[in-house]
């Protein structure tokens, strides 16, 4: 750059700083790059698949899936992990369906959890914005986008048509709160439901509610599905769950993680530690026996997981070793790598 351009740029930067404040424009090389802070999801495999060890702070995240797929359970697990780290969390319960007893079983400190059950979608999003701007809340869950009913729809007759009203509400709200979320370094998670598009011949007929704005503003989008049942004898005690990362602005997308959700207990973390420990050589498996550093810890996965539960120092050490290996490794290392297909690209457009 010649001297005249340098002088012109310096004058422009000086004027911008005087008018808009210091830091309004800066060179990226002037400051050290810092890793994006993350909050664990409570699932080791999902944290690894996300690439940064959890969900990114200061960003919007969307979690969507069919009914009873584990959406609320996953978000309550995020709250439990955040509270363990001393964070303040809020739950905007637009569905009016939050069960404090169930949340407590998943490790949530319900006494410290901020809960709102708004009457309208406008009220829910205004409360969310005010909590973000307080700079005092670290995690906010909005459950769910489909339940953010515009005031005009609530006050109108049952059969009235309100085309695009909810989509416009979401678009306006997200424009308003996105910058505040970044400044407050707050993680905002929107839970969303799935609807079917009529007349789709090719590609996925599934779509999410609330228009397209959330798809653009979300830094991470998670598609969560129930893939099977966990049984003890004939009794169903949990569900096999698969989470696919269909959008990720902070790490490579299209990774996936599989884990179990046990009813009344939440994500089966110790089971994940056993599986990933064997896969990456931290645990030895001989027949049905599992060993750690030459010492047998249990016969069968269930007994070995119970050993880790009874000996949390060993479980924590194993989890730390797995995280250090997989989260500091090259981008090619994945929790559950999947080959990108046309269906994946269709999912990304949901």
UniProtKB/Swiss-Prot annotation:
<dbReference type="InterPro" id="IPR049261">
    <property type="entry name" value="RecA-like_C"/>
</dbReference>
<dbReference type="GO" id="GO:0003697">
    <property type="term" value="F:single-stranded DNA binding"/>
</dbReference>
<keyword id="KW-0742">SOS response</keyword>
<keyword id="KW-0227">DNA damage</keyword>
<comment type="function">
    <text>Can catalyze the hydrolysis of ATP in the presence of single-stranded DNA, the ATP-dependent uptake of single-stranded DNA by duplex DNA, and the ATP-dependent hybridization of homologous single-stranded DNAs. It interacts with LexA causing its activation and leading to its autocatalytic cleavage.</text>
</comment>
<dbReference type="InterPro" id="IPR049428">
    <property type="entry name" value="RecA-like_N"/>
</dbReference>
<dbReference type="GO" id="GO:0003684">
    <property type="term" value="F:damaged DNA binding"/>
</dbReference>
<dbReference type="InterPro" id="IPR027417">
    <property type="entry name" value="P-loop_NTPase"/>
</dbReference>
<dbReference type="GO" id="GO:0005524">
    <property type="term" value="F:ATP binding"/>
</dbReference>
<dbReference type="InterPro" id="IPR020584">
    <property type="entry name" value="DNA_recomb/repair_RecA_CS"/>
</dbReference>
<dbReference type="InterPro" id="IPR023400">
    <property type="entry name" value="RecA_C_sf"/>
</dbReference>
<keyword id="KW-0963">Cytoplasm</keyword>
<feature type="region of interest" description="Disordered">
    <location>
        <begin position="329"/>
        <end position="350"/>
    </location>
</feature>
<feature type="binding site">
    <location>
        <begin position="65"/>
        <end position="72"/>
    </location>
    <ligand>
        <name>ATP</name>
    </ligand>
</feature>
<dbReference type="GO" id="GO:0005829">
    <property type="term" value="C:cytosol"/>
</dbReference>
<dbReference type="Pfam" id="PF00154">
    <property type="entry name" value="RecA"/>
</dbReference>
<dbReference type="InterPro" id="IPR003593">
    <property type="entry name" value="AAA+_ATPase"/>
</dbReference>
<dbReference type="GO" id="GO:0016887">
    <property type="term" value="F:ATP hydrolysis activity"/>
</dbReference>
<keyword id="KW-0067">ATP-binding</keyword>
<dbReference type="GO" id="GO:0006310">
    <property type="term" value="P:DNA recombination"/>
</dbReference>
<keyword id="KW-0238">DNA-binding</keyword>
<dbReference type="Pfam" id="PF21096">
    <property type="entry name" value="RecA_C"/>
</dbReference>
<dbReference type="InterPro" id="IPR020588">
    <property type="entry name" value="RecA_ATP-bd"/>
</dbReference>
<keyword id="KW-0233">DNA recombination</keyword>
<protein>
    <recommendedName>
        <fullName>Protein RecA</fullName>
    </recommendedName>
</protein>
<dbReference type="GO" id="GO:0009432">
    <property type="term" value="P:SOS response"/>
</dbReference>
<dbReference type="InterPro" id="IPR013765">
    <property type="entry name" value="DNA_recomb/repair_RecA"/>
</dbReference>
<dbReference type="GO" id="GO:0140664">
    <property type="term" value="F:ATP-dependent DNA damage sensor activity"/>
</dbReference>
<keyword id="KW-0234">DNA repair</keyword>
<feature type="compositionally biased region" description="Acidic residues">
    <location>
        <begin position="341"/>
        <end position="350"/>
    </location>
</feature>
<keyword id="KW-0547">Nucleotide-binding</keyword>
<dbReference type="InterPro" id="IPR020587">
    <property type="entry name" value="RecA_monomer-monomer_interface"/>
</dbReference>
<dbReference type="GO" id="GO:0006281">
    <property type="term" value="P:DNA repair"/>
</dbReference>
<comment type="similarity">
    <text>Belongs to the RecA family.</text>
</comment>
């Amino acid at each position: 750059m010649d001297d005249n351009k340098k002088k012109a740029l310096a004058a422009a930067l000086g004027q911008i700083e005087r008018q808009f404040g210091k830091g309004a424009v800066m060179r990226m090389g002037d400051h050290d790059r810092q890793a994006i802070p993350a909050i664990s999801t409570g699932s080791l495999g999902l944290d690894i698949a996300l690439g940064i060890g959890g969900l990114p702070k200061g960003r919007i995240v969307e979690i969507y899936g069919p009914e009873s797929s584990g959406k609320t359970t996953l978000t309550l697990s995020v709250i439990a992990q955040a509270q363990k780290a001393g964070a303040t969390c809020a739950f905007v319960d637009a569905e009016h369906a939050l069960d404090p007893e169930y949340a407590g079983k998943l490790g949530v400190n319900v006494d410290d959890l901020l809960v709102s059950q708004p009457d309208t979608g406008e009220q829910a999003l205004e409360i969310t914005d005010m909590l973000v701007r307080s700079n005092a809340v670290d995690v906010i869950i909005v459950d769910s986008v489909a339940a953010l009913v515009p005031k005009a729809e609530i006050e109108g007759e049952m059969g009235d048509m309100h085309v695009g009203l909810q989509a416009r509400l979401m678009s306006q709200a997200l424009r308003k709160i996105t910058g505040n979320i970044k400044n407050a370094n707050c993680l905002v998670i929107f839970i969303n439901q799935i609807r079917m598009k009529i007349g789709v011949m090719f590609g996925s007929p599934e779509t999410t509610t609330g228009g397209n704005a959330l798809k653009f503003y979300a830094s991470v989008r998670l598609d969560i599905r129930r893939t099977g049942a966990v049984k003890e004898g004939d009794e169903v005690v949990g569900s096999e769950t698969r989470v696919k990362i269909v959008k990720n602005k902070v790490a490579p997308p299209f990774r996936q993680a599989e884990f179990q959700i046990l009813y009344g207990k939440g994500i089966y973390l110790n089971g994940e530690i056993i599986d990933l420990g064997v896969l990456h050589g931290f645990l030895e498996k001989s027949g049905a026996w599992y060993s750690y550093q030459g010492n047998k810890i249990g016969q069968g996965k269930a007994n070995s997981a119970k050993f880790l539960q009874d000996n949390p120092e060993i479980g924590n050490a194993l989890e730390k070793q797995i995280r250090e290996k997989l989260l500091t490794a090259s981008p090619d290392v994945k929790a559950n790598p999947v080959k990108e297909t046309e269906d994946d690209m269709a999912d990304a457009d949901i």
